[in-house]
Amino acid sequence: VTAATTKFSKRNSGQFAKLGDVCVRAAGAVPGNVILFFPSYTVMEEVHKQIHGKITKELLKEHPNMSKEEKQKLLKEFKNTHLAGGVLLAVIGGSFSEGIDLPGTLLNGVIIVGLPLGQPDLETKELIRYYDTRFSRGWDYGYVFPAFTKALQSAGRCIRSETDRGVIVFVDERYAWESYYRCFPSDMTPKMTEFYEEAIKEFFRKKEPQSHNL
């Protein structure tokens, strides 16, 4: 879905409103549980302001510096909402983006909001320089690919076995750019569409045990 972006230079109230609208519509079209993954807590909080009160499902949210017990409690609460449907807001690269198991109908959809491309820190800059010197592709190997891998790992929470079925929605105009689109693995070919709500509903009307990427 290319209707909005989390690109730092374009962040403003209008952009967050667009992101919120996509999240409300996409999450509402998925029956049962959905996880919204964000590139940072800052973006998550801004979008939360936009969707609070507009999503009929129960909203749960990851917080910075949560203890192991708090994370386990939040995960249990999320699992318990799967019949009526719940929406968990979490951060790409955080505890809920890796190492959790939500098989079957415990998770029917994942929405990746934006790309986790922050300001390069010293370590990242060193990696960029190293890969530039060695392969002349420092920006790709040291910055873009690691961020994209984190986004894909978060998306992978939705499909953990051959019998799982669910929808993965990538929300950001940059996913359509050639420089980023080529980062998707060969077995994942997202479809660009403005009509994502209907595409999601149509997927769940069918019975094929596979994932659908938007």
Residue map of PLM features:
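ASCE RecA-like P-loop NTPase motor cores
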Residues: V1-L214
